[in-house]
Amino acid sequence: MECYYIVISSTHLSNGHFRNIKGVFRGPLSKNGNKTLDYAEKENTIAKALEDLKANFYCELCDKQYYKHQEFDNHINSYDHAHKQRLKELKQREFARNVASKSRKDERKQEKALQRLHKLAELRKETVCAPGSGPMFKSTTVTVRENLNDVSQRESVDPINNQQDLIPSEEKERDGTTALAETETASNCTANNCQIGDQSQAVHRHRIGFSFAFPKKATVKLESCSAAAFSEYSDESSMEKEFSRKTRFVPSTSHLQLPPPTCELLSSEEKGNSPPPEAMCTDKATAQTEERKITSNENNTLLTSSFCQLQHYIPTCSEADTCQNLAPFEDQLPMEAVIVNEDGPVSKSNPNIIEKNPTVPNDRTSAQMTTEENITINDVTKMETRNKIDHEPLTPSSTIEESIRLQKRPDLCKRQCDPFVPVLNKLGSTVLQWPSEMLAYTTTEPSISYSCNPLCFDFKSTKLNNNQDKNKLTLNDLFSEQKEDCCKGAHADCKDVPIARVTNDETGHSKNDYPQVTTLSPVHVLSNGCDLGQNENVGQRYKHISCTNRQTNKYKFTRCQIKRDMLNEKYDKMRLKETREHWFHKSRRKKKRRKLCRYHPGKSSKEPEGSGKTERSRQRTDEARKNPREPVLEKHPRSPERASDLHQLPDERPKAASTHLGEKETMNTTVNTESNDAAPGSQNCGGKNATVVNEQAKPLVIHSVKQNLTYVRTYCCWKARTSRYQEDDGSLASQSNVKGPTQNQPVKRGYSSLTNDSERIHRKRRQHSCSYSSDESLNQQHHLGEYLKPLSTSLISCQPKKKRRRKRSRLHIGDGTTKMKGNSNYPMKCSSLSQPDELAKDCIKEDINPQENVSIEKNSEQTEQTEIKGMLHPYNPLLSEPSGEGEHSVTETTPCDSSQTSNDLATPVNVTRDPSNSTTDNTLLEHNQRSQTTNSNEKQTPFKVTNPERNFRHSQAKSYICRYELAETIPQGKTNEASTEWLCYNSGILNTQPPLQFKEAHVSGHAFVTTEQILAPLPLPEQALLIPLENHDKLKHLPCEVYQHIIQPNMLTNKVKFTFPPPPLPPPSTPVQPLPLQRPFCSTSVTTIHHTVLQHHAAAAAAAAAAAAAGTFKVLQPHQQFLPQVPALARTSIPQISVGTVGPRLCPGGQPALVASPQMPIIPASVLHPSPLAFPPLPHSFFPSLLSPHPTVIPLQPLF
């Protein structure tokens, strides 16, 4: 039945009439819009409808025929028809959607295919193929090129051109280092290359390589005889990388098979590029036949074999890389074959020939690398190892390797240019592009290239390994370049040295004196192959020994272990560069241990053999640099005597040197540049000083970046030293006389080397802890070591037993041993910047009453014994000044010391860091005499004091808080416990202002204490607290009472270290003499915190002491940067308070307390003690002079 309900949404009839009625259809509307139609019109319309019935009233969608217009319209408007219409539209829409999606997919596929094609095209065009981009990413087959001859011809010709290009650059590299003969030979080589290359092109042009692959899962077991056919440099490479990857092939001795028969098979460029044996062995006339003879020849076996193997016998592409490929790569073959050549003929052969090798192999390898990119190493492991070896300038032992590889590095990049080797398939129809990474070659006469199935090859690992090698390259490039530069400089000298002499006498120097020798003179290396081991540390010695064993034992597999050791050492050295600071701490500890064993008190006679040897090796280095040195020797009257020390040692081989040399190896590269500059200075002060200079320069040099700074430092030290030397020459002589003639110079040397080693360690370490603002700060660093020596010597005599027992082995060498040491090194103390005239300026003129000194000395002795425990703390920011109230420290400063107070703020750190100085009073006596003589130069009357006094003066002279600050003596324990941050602070402040003269203030017979003394570490053994307050600025203006509450006892316990020394001896009864006071350095003196952990007694004793005496304290904030020039100040401000028995002396009852600024809280000795000792603020009139230097910089309001 028809549905007569219309679709409500429709507003038009099917014939286009507008329909304003919703609901049941009533019929069409009249034209005029009236609902009521004329009857006539109605008839007409009906008639028309009937006429049109059959034709017009057919619904195609529903396939229905209507005879009446009304019926048709009803149908059109019915739900039935509308539903069908909707279904139809949905179908159409869905179809369209499907079509669109399909078309889109097709488009995407086409785009991807196009992209793939473009990528493939680009990859084929690429000149360099990164490892790992092999067959996985590229189609391995290509249509056969029509003319294979063209391919082989082009590829064989190119290498020759490349090689010719390479030769000039290499010759440039060798310019300064190699002789004319070498250049001529190289040029001849190139000529030969051209000729032979042209000849051989015709012969080998038709050949193309072939390859076979093992099935994927097949475990191929090669018989021993057949396995010998495969070149085993895969094994060699795995020696290097064994810890990371296992070797793919069974190790065999086959890799030693000499490739000489290859010379027949050598491709055009191979013959040209490989150093023709005529070139290598000058006496040989013809290339091919002679080469065979040579290889058969036993003596020359080593030369030719090593060279043949060194020369990548990489066949050109023309020879299809397989048949002629005598692959043993130089890189896989340990260069030691060449280096350790012990056969007579090799060492006899011209140095030119051997020296030529670095270039010749390069010429050849470069050419072959470029041409023969196709044939790489056994697997990528080899590639990595090759890169690794190339990029790692090994330790000086493998210096020839290094030089060759340095030159070869550019070639490596070119070598990888052609990532695929064209290989003919079985049918001969197509040329397979075989990834060259995977190819390896046998050493058989027609060398066969073999590789594993590409599906089995691990490209990722090779890529990772190559990345690692690149990283290593970045680190080692600097090192190797430096070595290269050094080598160029010293190469001429190296050549002059007769080999016999090198082996006997100069193995000692060869490392220090001629680091270049080891680098670039292969003659030296060849002759000394075994001897070099002595110079390097033990691991490298093993390396050389292993090299000889390898040669004799046909490269036994034990080389894996040795090489692993080598690699570990290399990595250690790299790590040393990267994380020096940690390493320095470690090495310092080790050195201490070694010295404990080495310098045992009973063995003082043997000592020169141990410690002295290390120094002797260095002295030999000085001796070896005769050219710069000898004029200097003549300059200075006393230097020849000391220089004699240098020459007494020729026979003794310093065994201990090897232990230290490992550390120095990294330094040696840079030391050369500076050693020449430092040499005169070191010679001036005698052999010992020379050694000291070199040592100092070396650790400083570790930062190759700072070469110029270190140069300045060494130079300045030398100047100051020379001036100082002239000043002190007489005093030294008198001191030596005082000491007595019986002292052994060897013993002295031992002592000097001992102190130098420790100094060197400290200096290295200091170099990292300090950030220096200028060259002067570096200079300060240079001198720190000097300060150490006398101080530690003074301390040792008084040290408590425990420490003494530990250090005695190092320190108690005997009274005689240190006699010259303090003096000889002392000249170095002159501030490196100060010239002799500047010395006079900087020197502080002081008057001291001998009585005062005596009293001070007694007091200092007493306090010192109590406090020595802390003495050995490695960082001693506050140099231990005798515990006498610092009166003595100022008086005792020698002019050099005073000048260095300005320059050597770093010195405080050093002083106690080197406890290893021997304890003789003699050195102290000398030191005091020197200081007295220098003072007398400045018109101060020299006075003599007892040995204990001298001890303390000796140590006192060393402690300077700041150039402008009167360095108050602090118990040496306290000084030793000072933190390294003080060093950072010191380095910057030093050079900002001219030294201020000392001021004497007398207050009622008591020494008037200026801010210097307030701030300076007092020699009091009493308890003191370190109160690190982060919000110190907020609390700065609070009165002491408020401060008291801010500081919580738990906070104190957390942040304060207590050291409990033995109870202090009673203070000396003699009244304190007026102190000569230096004008304070306003900007830093008060606000400089010696971030030191002060010594503390037991709580009861401390509390009693605190109650008994008005406390003095110092607030020093090293971490606030008060001067713009001082970049390296520590970061946290720590008010430090020491309460001691000195209070009544420093602050007599009649006068207001000195220490009363509100920002300086005074905390009682015991942490739990509730009430602080508060002093009223000082009037400004007390310190009129303090404001003058830097009024703007003073951060403390009330104190000034």
Swiss-Prot record:
A single GO molecular function term of this UniProt record: zinc ion binding
Q: Which residue stretches does the UniProt record annotate as biased composition, category Polar residues?
A: 667-687, 732-756, 891-944
PROSITE patterns cross-referenced by the UniProt entry: ZINC_FINGER_C2H2_1
Compositional bias of type Basic and acidic residues: which residue ranges?
Answer: 604-666
Picking any one GO biological process from the record gives: positive regulation of dendritic spine maintenance
Q: Name one GO cellular component term.
A: growth cone
Report keywords, A-Z.
Answer: Metal-binding, Zinc, Zinc-finger
Domain of life of the native organism = Eukaryota
Q: Where is this region: Disordered?
A: 252-280, 343-367, 582-687, 727-777, 799-828, 874-949
- Entry's InterPro entries? ZnF-G_patch_domain, Znf_C2H2_sf, Znf_C2H2_type
Quote the protein name from its UniProt record.
Answer: Zinc finger protein 804A
**Organism the protein comes from:** Mus musculus (Mouse)
Q: Where is the composition biased (Basic residues)?
A: 585-603, 800-811
The upper taxonomy is:
Eukaryota, Metazoa, Chordata, Craniata, Vertebrata
Give positions of the C2H2-type zinc fingers.
57-81
